[in-house]
Amino acid sequence: MSLTYMNMFMAFTISLLGLLMYRSHMMSSLLCLEGMMLSLFVMMTMTILNTHLTLASMIPIILLVFAACEAALGLSLLVMVSTTYGMDYVQNLNLLQC
């Protein structure tokens, strides 16, 4: 495993740990999700470029499309929750009441 793959794996792991440990605010959870998606994009792009898979070259672009949709939905949910409840704490949100 090369050094760049190990760095991207560490970035993914740190983002995942940040998502699991610091779940107090919705904005920090969204930032951790974006870090995970970015590290996945870089790892997939490097793997496809190193193995010369031309048929799979669209997969990182599709991942970026899903990441953009996830970011837009997450930010719209953040705006809706913060205007409705006046806070963005994840612990105080209940999916059955929202």
From Swiss-Prot:
InterPro entries: NADH_UbQ_OxRdtase_chain4L/K (IPR001133), NUOK/Mnh_C1-like (IPR039428). Core subunit of the mitochondrial membrane respiratory chain NADH dehydrogenase (Complex I) which catalyzes electron transfer from NADH through the respiratory chain, using ubiquinone as an electron acceptor. Part of the enzyme membrane arm which is embedded in the lipid bilayer and involved in proton translocation. Keywords: Electron transport, Membrane, Mitochondrion, Mitochondrion inner membrane, NAD, Respiratory chain, Translocase, Transmembrane, Transmembrane helix, Transport, Ubiquinone. It comes from the Eukaryota. GO terms for biological process: ATP synthesis coupled electron transport. Gene3D superfamilies: 1.10.287.3510. It is a multi-pass membrane protein. The chain crosses the membrane at residues 1-21, 29-49, 61-81. It is an enzyme of class 7 (translocase). It catalyses: a ubiquinone + NADH + 5 H(+)(in) = a ubiquinol + NAD(+) + 4 H(+)(out). Core subunit of respiratory chain NADH dehydrogenase (Complex I) which is composed of 45 different subunits. The lineage of its organism: Eukaryota, Metazoa, Chordata, Craniata, Vertebrata. Pfam families: Oxidored_q2 (PF00420). Its EC number is 7.1.1.2. Belongs to the complex I subunit 4L family. This is NADH-ubiquinone oxidoreductase chain 4L. It is found in: Mitochondrion inner membrane. GO terms for molecular function: NADH dehydrogenase (ubiquinone) activity. GO terms for cellular component: mitochondrial inner membrane; respiratory chain complex I.
